[in-house]
Design a protein with these regions (language model features):
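Intrinsically disordered, low-complexity terminal tails
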Residues: 1-28, 282
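Assembly/oligomerization interface modules of large self-assembling protein complexes
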Residues: 21-95
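Short helix/loop capping segments that flank catalytic or ligand/cofactor-binding pockets
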Residues: 109-110, 187-189, 269-271
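Sequence/fold signature of self-assembling virion shell proteins
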Residues: 2-3, 7-10, 192-282
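Extended, solvent-exposed, turn-rich assembly/linker loops in the middle of proteins
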Residues: 139-209
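Alpha-helical scaffold segments that mediate packing/assembly in large oligomeric complexes
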Residues: 97-170, 278-282
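Generic beta-strand structural signal
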Residues: 95-97, 176
Length: 282
């Protein structure tokens, strides 16, 4: 299926039995594209698979006093932590694409070349889902849990102290992820505090820009310029999956077109609202 001796796609349609394998081939190629471009595992604390379009996540919002494990005298009432369902349902988004190709364009192409196109569809799905996750981190999931915002000391100018303020905003959570746009990443890496020979060597050798404040840096166009999201990836976000990658396939005989519809349905919910915060540089 790959390499110089790769078969053409028409091999799938040589027999009825082999044609039945085509949707599975499409599904696996799209999933591979999602996995290769997917940054969601870096920000998701847990993934929940459901068999319904309605889902309410749970939440526990203890006060500062309730977070303290105080001494309990013998026979005294033990303080409780309440876990409840959220008021608003998790918003699920159905993302997909229809792949339409003529018999000629499809059947006479090599499988490995066609796989590249399918993997790109998967990559687009992954990027769109990551944008959905970013939106929930910033604006909340509809349960009045938008991220706290920290503003830069000087509008339009990013300083090391601004990043420290973001770091402190997450207390008692651990800042281990920073999400920002490419242009904002350049500003971060241009700060004098992050300019050292070791960082430059690692960047040139591995493509990894380093870990400012010990946090993994994620670059994406899903975040507006001048905005930096900081979060504790271990307890900030839940991914809710109603339908994994699904492929429906048919053909239009009168036009000799092959059609494959690729869809996936998922949404995101906040677990602990205080585990994410936003730095607005302006």
């Amino acid at each position: 299926m790959a390499g110089a001796g790769s078969d053409s796609v028409r091999k799938f349609f040589a027999t009825t039995q082999s044609a039945a394998l085509f949707p599975e081939y499409v599904s696996r190629a799209v999933k591979q594209g999602i996995e290769e471009a997917d940054m969601l595992p870096s920000v998701i604390a847990t993934t929940t698979h459901i068999n319904s379009l309605d889902y309410r996540t749970i939440a526990s919002v203890p006060t500062d006093e309730e977070k303290k494990l105080v001494d309990v005298e013998e026979g005294a009432e033990i303080p409780e932590t309440v876990v409840r369902t959220q008021e608003s349902l998790v918003t699920l988004h159905k993302r997909g694409r229809m792949l339409v190709a003529s018999y000629e364009a499809l059947k006479y192409q090599k499988i490995d070349l066609f796989s590249v196109t399918l993997r790109q569809i998967g990559a687009h799905i992954a990027r769109t889902q990551f944008a959905d996750a970013v939106n929930v981190l910033i604006n909340g999931d509809g349960n009045e849990n938008a991220a706290a915002t920290v503003s830069a000391a000087t509008t339009g100018t990013l300083t090391y102290n601004d990043l420290l303020n973001l770091y402190n905003q997450l207390d008692p959570y651990c800042l281990n992820r920073l999400i920002m746009s490419p242009s904002t990443m350049l500003k971060v890496m241009s700060l004098d505090e992050f300019k050292n020979p070791l960082t430059g060597i690692n960047f040139q050798g591995t493509g990894n820009p380093g870990n400012p404040l010990g946090a993994k840096l994620l670059r994406t166009n899903s975040v507006a310029d001048g905005t930096i999201i900081g979060l504790d990836a271990g307890c900030a976000l839940e991914m809710v999956v109603a339908a994994d990658v699904n492929v429906d396939y048919d053909k239009l005989i009168d036009r000799q077109l092959e059609r494959a519809v690729i869809t996936t349905t998922a949404g995101f919910a906040k677990i602990f609202s205080g585990a994410s915060a936003v730095l607005n540089v302006g």
